UniProtKB/Swiss-Prot annotation:
Residues 22-45 have a biased composition (Basic and acidic residues). It comes from the Eukaryota. Residues 1-20 form the signal peptide. Residues 20-66 are annotated as: Disordered. One of its GO terms (cellular component) is extracellular region. It is found in: Secreted. Keywords: Secreted, Signal. Residues 50-66 have a biased composition (Gly residues). This is Glycine/glutamate-rich protein sgp1. The lineage of its organism: Eukaryota, Metazoa, Ecdysozoa, Arthropoda, Hexapoda.
Amino acid sequence: MKYSLIFILTLACLIASSLARPEGEEKPADDAAGDKKEEGAEGDKTAAGGDEGFTGGDGKNAGGAGNPMKVVQDIIKKITDAVNPLRMTEGFLGGGGSGGSGALFG
């Protein structure tokens, strides 16, 4: 049972990493459709203050809100942060935010 859980988690991580793309890459479907966009054109509009309040409403730059893989990665990060043994002992070792006064190494 323990090994099957490890196998499933490993498989899920491999699939997630293989589906992940760097932020600069476009989707393969966009390339196949012939949509030729200049890179940085939308960002230049927002930097220049043009296009009357353009906020990047296409969902691509909305912090991953429309990206299901980003949601999965955020969930995995929250779980690993919750069970991280170093965070559990943070108050004991003196890494807390109480003015730098910790119990052991503060």
